[in-house]
């Protein structure tokens, strides 16, 4: 299986066995935000090391026009299902990245599993 690791999987340090794995540039942004807003210097340092390790292990997949188109479709689907796409914009961008690249989205975020009707998303 070729997979995209959701931020929740990266943060948890979940051990995953897949043929190949990737992360989204959105995950890099979310991790950086978490570092910048962490008041505890020890936790900030731990998170910085985690981010450095992720950047060494993976070449983040960018948000490009194909991902943007996939996001627009997922956001419209989300709204049609009565959910708020803007509240989950980063999650939907990560999901769109998986969809655009034909990857399985691996997540620990149960709120993403409802996308399984339109995306290969699996809980880990």
Question: Which positions does each model-derived feature cover?
Answer:
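Short, polar loop motifs at secondary-structure junctions
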Residues: 7-14, 108-111
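PIN-domain endoribonuclease scaffold, especially VapC-family toxins
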Residues: 2-3, 13-96, 114-124
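C-terminal structural segments of small proteins and small subunits
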Residues: 100-106, 110-113
């Amino acid at each position: 299986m070729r997979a995209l690791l959701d931020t929740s999987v990266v943060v948890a340090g979940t051990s995953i066995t897949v043929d190949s794995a990737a992360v989204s540039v959105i995950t890099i942004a979310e991790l950086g935000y978490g570092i910048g807003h962490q008041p505890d210097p020890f936790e900030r340092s731990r998170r910085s090391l985690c981010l450095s390790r992720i950047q060494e292990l993976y070449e983040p997949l960018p948000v490009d026009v194909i991902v943007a188109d996939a996001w627009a479709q997922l956001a419209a689907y989300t709204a049609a299902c009565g959910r708020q796409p803007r509240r989950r914009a980063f999650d939907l961008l990560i999901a769109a990245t998986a969809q655009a690249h034909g990857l399985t989205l691996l997540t620990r975020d149960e709120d993403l599993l409802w996308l399984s009707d339109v995306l290969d998303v699996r809980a880990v």
